[in-house]
Amino acid sequence: MKKPILSLLILVFLVINLNAQRKCAVGDASDEKLKRRHEILNTKLQDYYQKYDKQNIFVDNLIRIPVVVHIIHNNTSGKIGGEGNNNISDEQVFSQIRVLNEDYRKKISTPGFNNSPVGTDMNIEFYLADKDPDGNPTLGINRIYSSKSSFDVFDENTLLSSLSYWDSNRYLNIWVTTLKDDFLGYAEFPVGEFDGLELEEVDEAIDGVMIDHRAFGSKTGTSTNGVYTHGRTLTHEIGHWLGLIHTWGDEYCGDDFCNDTPPTESGNLSIKCTPKYSNCRGTRTLNMIENYMDYTADSCMNIFTNDQKSRVRAILEVSKRRKRLITNSEFNLPQTEKLIVKVLENPSSTDYLQFQILLNAFANFNYEIFDASGKQIIQASFEDSPSRLIQIPKIDLGKGIYNLRVKSGEEIVYNRLISQ
Ligand SMILES: [Zn+2]
């Protein structure tokens, strides 16, 4: 049946309005501060590439990122889940974590898979934190009531953090609430550290992602209607948190500093995934509307590229706060009030002598192992380290009784190690 053109136009107009347009506050090009931060970050990365051999630095290890989800809701009854309730269900949170892992691992048989030669498995996984900042078991979900019905992404991030926050050196904080002005989400960028450059590190307390509950999770709870309900807003925002820039570089035919994402005139707001083209630098090219760092509808997205991965890996090496978070996650040991050394199973029944070094903050420390005659056999130093596990192969020591000396700042702890 032939439809009147007028009603078709009205329908399209309504659909667009009902779904709103993807609005990621990071792309607000009028914000000079953000733009400057992009420039600083890229200058530093270029230095980094020159300083080190790229091949040797980027080990493709699996990175696991602990996430804490703060649900800031205005539901006085405290009821969890249900239609329109911004005190969203645990299931909605779980659906979001699942999507992150599908997208960042390019999982086969999921919407996060692609066949593109430049499409990559980022080799990054996300999990709800299993220990709170005091080391107690947790689900990684905090529910906080606030009488405020919505929050402004630019002016009220500190307020949001004051309601609930875990150390951003150890957790990726995600604040899920109702955002003002149709924004879907906002993320803070990482920074690197190089000599000779001054950097404005963002306040620890707001380092994370803010996201509207209606764009959080996949087809679950309050995230069911519209084109931004497949969980890709958070995939996109965490891309920023890891240092990625929009594919059009936040300006007309701008640069995202990745060579395998084609030049793009501007963000694509397509909700039907139809091909889009750009005419940048005198050449007509197909836009990569499927890139997570574009503005297309969730269902169009399924790709991070090899260069985006290289960029993220470089940033994770140089960004102090991100590196701390990843290292801490690797060991997942508690902070203590003072330096404590715990020798595990002494003598050990395995091929290793193992001891935990528990610190009260990220700190420098060294350990030395001496034989019975007082001769130093092994020593190692660590900088800006969280509490960590040390494993010494018995074969490196031989049988005997050894003295272990651990020093961090002014604190020194001695222990005896038995190697049998
Ligand atoms: Zn964005």
Language-model regions: role of each:
Residues 1-29, 100, 389-392, 414:
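Bacterial Sec-dependent N-terminal signal peptides
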Residues 3-4, 379-383, 399-420:
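C-terminal tail/sorting-segment detector
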Residues 21-168, 178:
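Propeptide-to-catalytic entry region of secreted or membrane-anchored zinc metalloproteases
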Residues 154-246:
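Active-site-proximal segment of zinc-dependent metalloprotease catalytic domains
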Residues 217, 221-302:
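The catalytic-center signature of Zn2+-dependent metalloproteases
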Residues 301-338:
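A recurrent domain-boundary module in secreted/ectodomain proteins
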Residues 335-360, 370-375, 399, 417-420:
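Surface-exposed, proline-anchored Ser/Thr-rich loop/turn motifs
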Residues 354, 376-397:
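Glycine-centered tight-turn motifs at strand-turn-strand junctions
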